[in-house]
Amino acid sequence: PFSENEQALGFPKEAMNLMKLVLKSDSPIAGKTLREADLRHRVQALIVGIERGAQKILNPESDFRMDAGDIVWIVGESKKIRSFLESK
């Protein structure tokens, strides 16, 4: 649930999900940089963190290349994100 301050921003609850996804080798964003993946414009989502083994990267740079097996933390509407990531 959202706090009063978050509700006051006017964002619908479903648009503010924090998702944790493991990138598969056939993911449309595996092997791409954040800039190339362009999730911000494609599905109105932001990648806020990436875990690669023991390495944890908060707010990765746009030239960071994502690999299969990376754990990606994304903020956005889960329905849009899943639909995009499941497309081939």
Please describe what each predicted stretch is.
Residues 1-88:
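Cytosolic regulatory regions of ion transport systems
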